[in-house]
């Protein structure tokens, strides 16, 4: 949120969100670094950024009591918590007679802008994508290049140290994104040993790059890459129209799936100790870097849900803690896709065999050897499950 009394710049870090994270969470470090950059830029114009830390509703109430606020501007957020938070902020502002303006920002199309002819939301990706492209080609997409900072409020707020906010440095750094990787994305995207992905996820997630700028740059470069950006918006509109997916299956008929939920097996999956190299390499990469190649994400998710028969919500929550590019909509949508419980999901009989996947996408074990140093040592664990025995009971099969 930015609170503006004419040209006064303020930012509120939401305690309800950050208190659930480790103090050295790399994403908090990333946000802090970019807020500091904003503050330094403002100081060039004799202004500064005031940083608050707390419950946003309480902070806004306190601000309105202390200073005169003309209006508040913020961007739309489509997660249920954020929607309720912003409604609470709006109510507080109304008590003080302060207008509350919200805007679309993190997507090209939102909410009801890409729907069926009858106004209902799409629940299958391909027709959504086709309508999205049709609308995009009919819409003038512009990048705001306004750089007029002459009317900023003069201020010199001290920028807080990370420690003052209760955080500490992280050993994990968010990498810079590289759009040069987009050119051959369709040819290289499934090979995890290649450094062939743009790493743009965290930057889209935290708004350090404009989705409009990115789409305009890649739309004529690689259609496969553009499709991935459209998938992101597809899952966002699913979350908007069907908020129950946060904690429930998209399709209620799968609520009777009999998850085994073996805690010891889940722990081994988290630690990359399943005895299946492709799965373990992915989990070890995630734990060390906050990143996992998309092909490997599908393999690890399928293994957890369809070989170990552990509830997708367990895996979704673990990824939420670790992924630098974590977005609720995409994370939830992809996990439900892998489990077969979501919209446009992989059916129960589609199982990513991690051993067969090696033959297709890491035949020389280049990726695996990078992340599993003890692959051929006695210390490497034995497989925790027989791949020939997929844990789908007959009642569970019937539920599908």
Across the structure, where does each feature detected by a protein language model lie?
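Intrinsically disordered, low-complexity boundary segments flanking structured domains
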Residues: 35-40, 88-89, 109-114, 186-191, ...
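Active-site-proximal binding-pocket segments
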Residues: 196-369
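Glycine/tryptophan-enriched, flexible segments
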Residues: 120-254, 357-389, 393
């Amino acid at each position: 949120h930015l609170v503006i009394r004419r040209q006064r710049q303020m930012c509120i870090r939401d305690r309800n969100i950050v208190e659930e994270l480790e103090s050295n969470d790399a994403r908090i470090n990333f946000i802090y670094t970019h807020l500091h950059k904003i503050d330094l830029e403002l100081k060039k114009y004799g202004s500064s950024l005031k940083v608050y830390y707390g419950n946003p509703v309480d902070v806004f109430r306190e601000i309105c009591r202390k200073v005169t606020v003309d209006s508040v501007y913020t961007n739309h957020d489509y997660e249920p918590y954020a929607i309720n938070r912003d409604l609470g902020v709006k109510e507080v502002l109304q008590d003080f007679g302060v207008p509350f303006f919200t805007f679309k920002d993190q997507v090209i199309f939102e909410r009801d802008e890409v729907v069926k002819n009858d106004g209902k939301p799409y629940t299958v990706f391909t027709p959504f994508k086709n309508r999205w492209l049709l609308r995009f080609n009919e819409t003038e997409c512009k990048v705001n290049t306004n750089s007029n900072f002459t009317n900023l409020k003069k201020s010199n707020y001290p920028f807080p140290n990370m420690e003052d906010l209760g955080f500490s440095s992280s050993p994990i750094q968010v990498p810079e994104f590289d759009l040069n990787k987009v050119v051959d994305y369709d040819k290289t995207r499934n090979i995890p040993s290649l450094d062939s992905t743009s790493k743009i996820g965290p930057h889209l997630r935290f708004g350090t790059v404009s989705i409009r700028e990115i789409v305009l740059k890649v739309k004529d470069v690689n259609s496969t890459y553009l499709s991935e950006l459209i998938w992101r918006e597809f899952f966002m509109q699913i979350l908007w129209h069907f908020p129950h997916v946060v904690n429930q299956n998209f399709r209620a008929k799968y609520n009777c799936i009999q998850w085994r939920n073996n805690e010891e097996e889940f722990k081994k999956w988290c630690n990359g100790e399943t005895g299946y190299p492709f799965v373990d390499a992915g989990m070890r990469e995630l734990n060390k870097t906050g990143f996992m190649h998309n092909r490997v994400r599908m393999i690890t998710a399928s293994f957890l849900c369809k070989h170990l028969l552990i509830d997708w919500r367990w895996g979704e929550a673990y990824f939420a803690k670790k992924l630098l590019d974590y977005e609720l909509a995409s994370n939830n949508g992809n996990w439900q896709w892998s489990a077969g419980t979501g919209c446009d999901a992989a059916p129960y009989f589609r199982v990513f065999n991690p051993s067969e996947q090696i033959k297709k996408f890491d035949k020389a074990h280049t990726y695996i050897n990078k992340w599993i140093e003890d692959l051929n040592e006695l210390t490497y664990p034995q497989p925790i499950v027989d791949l020939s025995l997929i844990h789908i009971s007959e009642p569970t099969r019937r539920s599908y």
